């Protein structure tokens, strides 16, 4: 049987980090087994579902490279199908109409709570065989078995069993003809021929109800795998503040999609002590039943380390487009400065994110705005002008503006003046960047460009003379 998995987000918000991990695990399991990965948009919550959220989910999936093998399925386009299946269950005596008012249902709930019981529907309409009537309270309820147990072998959690006596007759169709979650997902997974249902363990309590529906419909039962939740770094439930952000906010913060994928897969799964995987290695090695049943903890330091690894090792040509995007987000005209690939080579060892790289790269694309006064006091003081003037003369006369030529000019300055290279590099570094810290001084000057470098040296000389 062909493996078919699905990711089924509700478009009531963005794709968060937990949803992205679920999508990744579904995608990997399907790819490893040469199966199909499908996307279903569970958009029946008409008050909260939005097209903007749908677009955001699709955009995030595309950014992560989680491609799906068939067009997305939208639940709102399948309302007729849900009604057909509900009608079949009615005709077979496996479901029934109920017309209980909200007050009646609230009274049932309060009575159960007073006696310390679990709130549940009391089945008042189960045997009444009530006919259809136009009523705002009309629902269709599924006749859950009263006896026996529901058991299944979860690929992650192991054997799970529950008595049917703990389950009530759930609503499957609302008065407006829209399905409830538990009903819709069973019909969808059946129609989509899903063989493995991989989802968060917040759905584990729904599974026995769904299994009974599968049996009532005579539908083949998929295999279930319920993923443990992701906790924040303190071991608490994730919030927007502690990491449960829109996946695209990770992009905006400067993380690479393949770095995030590499990090996410390790939040619950491992292959020995190996930390870094390319995509094909993940496809070859990942197995859903190897996922740990315990909750994973977010570790932003580890994500930064993984991201920096790829910044250091990826081809600069592949890193250039996302770096340009980050520079443009800062209002920078990239055509006014050095090639992005050169910037990447200069900064890749010094940063963990593309956002940080773009911030540091501003010195090569924008006029120098300010000086670090501590750096000025230490390095742009009387006497420093000698090295700056000598370096300026050689830089202005270079036949070609290359890193090697710039480096030669600076070293020649140190040799000619019989001073250490630091006496040349540090005043020049402050003159060019306004700070005491930068990449290799020759590369820093080269990326600034001849005209801008000379202009900044002149400004530093004026600053020294007026100190």
Swiss-Prot record:
One annotated GO molecular function: glutamate-tRNA ligase activity
- Enumerate the Pfam families for this protein: Anticodon_2, tRNA-synt_1c
The source's superkingdom equals Bacteria
Q: Which InterPro entries does the annotation name?
A: aa-tRNA-synth_I_cd-bd (IPR045462), aa-tRNA-synth_I_codon-bd_sub2 (IPR020751), aa-tRNA-synth_I_CS (IPR001412), aa_tRNA-synth_I_cd-bd_sf (IPR008925), Glu-tRNA-ligase_bac/mito (IPR004527), Glu/Gln-tRNA-synth (IPR000924), Glu/Gln-tRNA-synth_Ib_cat-dom (IPR020058), GluQ/Sye (IPR049940)
Report the catalytic activity: tRNA(Glu) + L-glutamate + ATP = L-glutamyl-tRNA(Glu) + AMP + diphosphate
**GO cellular component terms listed in the entry, alphabetical order:** cytosol
Motif ('KMSKS' region) spans which residues?
237-241
Please state the Enzyme Commission number of this protein.
6.1.1.17
Indicate which residues the UniProt annotation says bind ATP.
Answer: 240
Question: Motif 'HIGH' region, which positions?
Answer: 9-19
Presence of keyword Aminoacyl-tRNA synthetase:
yes
Q: What class of enzyme is it?
A: ligase
For this protein, the record's SUPFAM superfamilies field holds: An anticodon-binding domain of class I aminoacyl-tRNA synthetases, Nucleotidylyl transferase
State its location(s): Cytoplasm
Primary location: cytoplasm
A GO BP annotation: glutamyl-tRNA aminoacylation
Asked whether the UniProt record includes Magnesium among its keywords, one would answer: no
The function of this protein is: Catalyzes the attachment of glutamate to tRNA(Glu) in a two-step reaction: glutamate is first activated by ATP to form Glu-AMP and then transferred to the acceptor end of tRNA(Glu).
Q: Which family does it belong to?
A: Belongs to the class-I aminoacyl-tRNA synthetase family. Glutamate--tRNA ligase type 1 subfamily.
Q: How does it assemble?
A: Monomer.
Stated name of the protein: Glutamate--tRNA ligase
Q: Which organism is it from?
A: Xylella fastidiosa (strain Temecula1 / ATCC 700964)
